[in-house]
């Protein structure tokens, strides 16, 4: 049996972004988000967000202007806080661990566009998943690119662009992000 475009997309394979099923879902999500982001009652707003996502744990809270493409590829653990203007482009799975906190304007981007102009012009897209461990804190305006895994207990400095994967217990900053400190499991900087 042939895979659907949604199945190919979620698996990180080449797919047609203008597939009818995908267009219908994106349109539905945009309409829902436009309405939900206007809700001032925090509990109601966050309950509505949760209903559109694949999985959320307990104590899920996102401020308004939360944006994503599909929702069915977003998996978030317990105790998540997202500040204003969080964007998750979820063509592939985005998995976020427990006790994670995102500053304003954090962007997680799984889509990958072909370098070959002919393939781009044919509306072919791909993607790569993003995985974020437990107890990760991201400062404002952090950007995480496709295929990145961020370990447990990582701090990502404001404005960083994360282009590659990082291990547990580090502080990363910059564009592209680089390690500036290693941490012990209590969060203390390890002196060299």
Question: What are the residue ranges of the model-derived segments?
Answer:
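Short arginine-rich
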Residues: 37, 164-169
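Terminal amphipathic alpha-helical/low-complexity segments used for targeting or macromolecular assembly
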Residues: 1-59, 177-192
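Hydrophobic alpha-helical segments typical of transmembrane helices
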Residues: 45-48, 140, 158
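Flexible, glycine/small-residue-enriched loop-and-beta-strand segment within the central core
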Residues: 66-150, 170, 175-192
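C-terminal/domain-terminus segments
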Residues: 153-165
């Amino acid at each position: 049996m042939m895979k659907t475009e949604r199945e190919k997309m979620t698996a990180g394979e080449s797919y047609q972004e203008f597939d009818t099923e995908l267009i219908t879902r994106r349109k539905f999500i945009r309409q829902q988000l436009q309405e939900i982001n206007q809700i001032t009652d925090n509990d109601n707003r966050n309950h509505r967000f949760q209903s559109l996502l694949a999985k959320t744990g307990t104590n899920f809270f996102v401020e308004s202007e939360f944006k994503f493409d599909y929702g069915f590829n977003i998996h978030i653990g317990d105790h998540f806080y997202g500040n204003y203007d969080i964007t998750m482009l979820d063509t592939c799975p985005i998995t976020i661990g427990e006790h994670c906190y995102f500053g304003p304007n954090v962007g997680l981007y799984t889509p990958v566009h072909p370098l070959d102009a002919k393939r781009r012009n044919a509306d072919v897209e791909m993607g790569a998943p993003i995985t974020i461990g437990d107890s990760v804190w991201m400062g404002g305006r952090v950007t995480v690119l496709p295929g990145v895994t961020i370990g447990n207990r990582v701090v990502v400095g404001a404005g960083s662009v994360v282009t590659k994967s990082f291990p547990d217990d580090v502080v990363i900053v910059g564009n592209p992000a680089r390690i500036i400190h290693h941490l012990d499991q209590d969060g203390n900087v390890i002196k060299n």
